[in-house]
Amino acid sequence: MKLLLLTLTVLLLLSQLTPGGTQRCWNLYGKCRHRCSKKERVYVYCLNNKMCCVKPKYQPKEKWWPF
């Protein structure tokens, strides 16, 4: 029983200490970063003041407004 409690405690501490990776954005297609890679573009900004880096194929197409 003590071993089980110790194992659960260690797993809980490890899950709090190591983040799961970068925050996701734009319907889980983008990642919040300080800088985007060459193959990505900024479309929106994340809540943590980082850029939401999204590959161009996942960004919406620009539509021209008819006048």
From Swiss-Prot:
Source superkingdom: Eukaryota
Keywords, comma-separated and alphabetical: Antibiotic, Antimicrobial, Defensin, Disulfide bond, Secreted, Signal
Signal peptide per UniProt: 1-20
Similarity comment: Belongs to the beta-defensin family.
Compartments in which it is found: Secreted
Name of this protein: Beta-defensin 123
Organs and tissues of expression: Abundant expression in the male reproductive tract only. Expressed abundantly in testis, while expression in epididymis decreased gradually from caput to cauda.
Main localization of the protein described in the UniProt heading: secreted
GO biological process: defense response to bacterium; innate immune response
InterPro entries named among the record's database cross-references: Beta-defensin, Beta_defensin_dom
Disulfide partners: C25-C52, C32-C46, C36-C53
A GO CC term attached to the entry: extracellular region
Purpose of the protein: Has antibacterial activity.
